[in-house]
Amino acid sequence: MENIFSKDSDIELVDIENSIKSSYLDYSMSVIIGRALPDARDGLKPVHRRILYAMQNDEAKSRTDFVKSARIVGAVIGRYHPHGDTAVYDALVRMAQDFSMRYPSITGQGNFGSIDGDSAAAMRYTEAKMSKLSHELLKDIDKDTVDFVPNYDGSESEPDVLPSRVPNLLLNGSSGIAVGMATNIPPHSLNELIDGLLYLLDNKDASLEEIMQFIKGPDFPTGGIIYGKKGIIEAYRTGRGRVKVRAKTHIEKKTNKDVIVIDELPYQTNKARLIEQIAELVKERQIEGISEVRDESNKEGIRVVIELKREAMSEIVLNNLFKSTTMESTFGVIMLAIHNKEPKIFSLLELLNLFLTHRKTVIIRRTIFELQKARARAHILEGLKIALDNIDEVIALIKNSSDNNTARDSLVAKFGLSELQANAILDMKLGRLTGLEREKIENELAELMKEIARLEEILKSETLLENLIRDELKEIRSKFDVPRITQIEDDYDDIDIEDLIPNENMVVTITHRGYIKRVPSKQYEKQKRGGKGKLAVTTYDDDFIESFFTANTHDTLMFVTDRGQLYWLKVYKIPEGSRTAKGKAVVNLINLQAEEKIMAIIPTTDFDESKSLCFFTKNGIVKRTNLSEYQNIRSVGVRAINLDENDELVTAIIVQRDEDEIFATGGEENLENQEIENLDDENLENEESVSTQGKMLFAVTKKGMCIKFPLAKVREIGRVSRGVTAIKFKEKNDELVGAVVIENDEQEILSISAKGIGKRTNAGEYRLQSRGGKGVICMKLTEKTKDLISVVIVDETMDLMALTSSGKMIRVDMQSIRKAGRNTSGVIVVNVENDEVVSIAKCPKEENDEDELSDENFGLDLQ
């Protein structure tokens, strides 16, 4: 037997320790680069990239019919991915799950698993096709935009990376465990990512704080609520962080007990396992107060119902559930990805800049490809044009040639053409010798020369290149405009979230059933007087909008209820929605008691002692209290006003105290006897206005009456007081419907009726009276006008926002409304047809408003 250790042996001796190290390192790099970690540019692991590319080549696209998943898996493992079919199918399934992917890359048909942990059906039963978004990952791949590499056996080629018009790594996130390292990148909102990228294009040196004005944080496909910004900021700054996510819940009231309903779960939480976990904790008496847990989820969404015992407090039970179950989880962020064949942890800004760099590279390569193609075509057309310009000579030359080669050589020699041009001339059909075909060739050549010039300019100009990226990003956003799902709330030990929230003007609406939302006021474009408006909210069949107002996101909202309680809430904590969104139940935002109803909502920026809060009730009562008495925030609220039986709040106004105003410190004065004037309306028709010093309160009634009296005649009283009479009604069925504060008699008061009839009137036309009088006519009411709805002070910097009973909002320039006298009706302000105006408010003007129509060009004058 030959000695294997002899010098003549072909066997090479190696050190086993070094061999193991080398082999393990090779294996590690293979797993890291070729399997477990995503590429930082397109956000895909090799298996995901190969699945999409195989579907693209196999024509299993979203514009075609579904194909069997087994066909896709077979194409992937046969052509690109030399691994087991199970691994490929599992990856395909996850790409189609809307609870795993924020924006699924594949549309599945059949059983693709569930949030309860159910497995997908076998690949022979399910079908799949590319989603519309995945086309954006592969667009322009046929234009030499990315490098191709040989597949595992060298028989075909596959893309090293996809062109990816979307920032897919941040969009859908990624998770994976490699050798000695792992990645866990959360998904994000497409709209926010694009807004951040557009800002970064305009501001190359933008800071993280600036970018986070647009990219608020992760947006998980299962929704939930993120508590705290510190973990998000740390993850975005360093690439590592921890994000606390809770289930989204609401409380429903039943007879003598509460019900906790889970609407959304933390990302990657198994719903069935969660229900089992809660049941086990109740059985072991680790959580008290729960009588039943059941799953009422359906195709509309998640609904896990937790019924409580009568004596149980929902807040305590809910806190225990968060503490003891997966209703609260922590998402550990590790933004690790492959770049230049090496793993690296990225910050948010680095990933955004890397995506923009990738897109620049793709667009440059695409432009070069299109330029070469255009130049090649122009070259051919130039040859054809030369031939057409010398058609008789060309025909004679070809006829006198013995063969094609001779003809080609003769054309090249005679006209200075290239071989390509000569071949194109020889291949040209006789039909192209017509005048029409000649014109087509000339037009095509002219267009090509313009296109060549455009493409050359792109390659020369960084600005044009970035403009192309901007246009593509805006196009993507318009195609896939999906609002954020996951809410982000402040944490008890968090930084001041207001530093990260822009102070924007919002329209806040609340419905009869207590659904509240905020919408940027810019979404309601100003319309011409008499316009029909835009739908402000979609309500349930038995619901309608009760009130709306405008406020800034940093303002504090004071909610006053029918029980006289006052609660607080920051505007930015109200979920932002679209114009037609239903909103969120207000009971999830403030601690209302059972059957308690909100009657007034007042926005304020501070609780200055120089300000007062004036309440007006339906029965004509006015009450004034120093605003500072409402600043001590408690979760159970504070007492705001005592109401008489059958009375309710109409409005509440914050008023700045007059500088020379002096208040009595003793008991309640009999202000009824401190009269200035108390003249009947009939005697005021020919009277001159009476001027006064200081602010005045102006209240109006449903039947068109009004009263103006000095603010100083309503002194400040305590929080729990009742108030005093503002106006006495002439008619039994009359009631107070609105009130404003007048600074001086030069101001204009805008009044509007239920049928959209309105006018502007100088405040001086309304005589000053004593508080508690019967008032004077504010608006002349008829069958065409119906009842008076309310009044506002005209402000040239503000627009009027009117709300109808069907939920439409219309924005009107107050200056476009005609001025009219006190005892008149006015003109059509809002065209309500069979609808009615139910509320009005003021909001800031927008710069790009439409021009208003003049009174001479529009409408009905009801003077």
From Swiss-Prot:
Keyword annotations of the record: Antibiotic resistance, ATP-binding, Cytoplasm, DNA-binding, Isomerase, Nucleotide-binding, Topoisomerase
An annotated GO cellular component: chromosome
Pfam families the record matches: DNA_gyraseA_C, DNA_topoisoIV
Subcellular location: Cytoplasm
InterPro entries attached to this UniProt entry: GyrA (IPR005743), GyrA/parC_rep (IPR006691), Gyrase/topoIV_suA_C (IPR035516), Topo_IIA-like_dom_sf (IPR013760), Topo_IIA_A/C_ab (IPR013758), Topo_IIA_A_a_sf (IPR013757), Topo_IIA_dom_A (IPR002205), Type_II_DNA_Topoisomerases (IPR050220)
Coiled coil (UniProt feature): none
Major place of residence: cytoplasm
UniProt-recorded Gene Ontology molecular function terms: ATP binding; DNA binding; DNA negative supercoiling activity
Known catalytic reactions: ATP-dependent breakage, passage and rejoining of double-stranded DNA
Keyword Cytoplasm: yes
Phenotype when changing residue 86 to I: In strain: UA580R1, UA536, UA543 and UA549; confers resistance to nalidixic acid and ciprofloxacin
Enzyme type, top EC level: isomerase
Family: Belongs to the type II topoisomerase GyrA/ParC subunit family.
Function per UniProt: A type II topoisomerase that negatively supercoils closed circular double-stranded (ds) DNA in an ATP-dependent manner to modulate DNA topology and maintain chromosomes in an underwound state. Negative supercoiling favors strand separation, and DNA replication, transcription, recombination and repair, all of which involve strand separation. Also able to catalyze the interconversion of other topological isomers of dsDNA rings, including catenanes and knotted rings. Type II topoisomerases break and join 2 DNA strands simultaneously in an ATP-dependent manner.
Name of the molecule in the record: DNA gyrase subunit A
Species in which this protein is naturally found: Campylobacter jejuni subsp. jejuni serotype O:2 (strain ATCC 700819 / NCTC 11168)
